[in-house]
Amino acid sequence: MKDMTTTPVDPFRVVFVCTGNICRSPMAEVVFRENADAVGLGSRVVSTSAGTGDWHVGERADQRTLDALERRGYDGTRHRARQFTHDDFGGSDLVIALDRSHERILRGWARDEGDADKIALLMAFDPHAATLDVPDPYYAGRGMFDEVLAMIESASRSLFRQLEPAIRPVI
């Protein structure tokens, strides 16, 4: 008799990268995960984030980030900052930079063409984006955190729509 067991397919792994991993990339991590959860694909996606620098390793997301997320119905309280490592290339299908400076750093860290091919800018996925860079709200006020979150939501929706066919299991 034919074996009817199925082989589980590994989830699609995305890591979002900003500077300190306390503002932009945690927002993107949470929003992308919520996009997957909203259509029943949460188990098919692993959304993480990291920073190019190590200044905030182990810290929670900036309180203004958590507040902006909460105002839009997201929960970012489980986040702890970490620094991007070379292992992230091997453990990810896609490495999403929040601005061009992060993209340059990541390309410099890429060990080979396979690593480099995984790197993309988040805003490049949003056809309506006025810029390729998500501005750093760290030295700004509440309004900028809300604006940045809105940019991330729009680009994340576009990214998810483009990835969904590859994420959705074939039945």
Q: Which functions belong to the PLM regions below?
A:
Residues 2-3, 94, 100-171:
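Phosphate-binding/catalytic loops
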Residues 2-91, 161-171:
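Conserved active-site segments centered on acidic
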Residues 18, 69, 96-97, 152:
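Hydrophobic structural packing positions in well-ordered secondary structure
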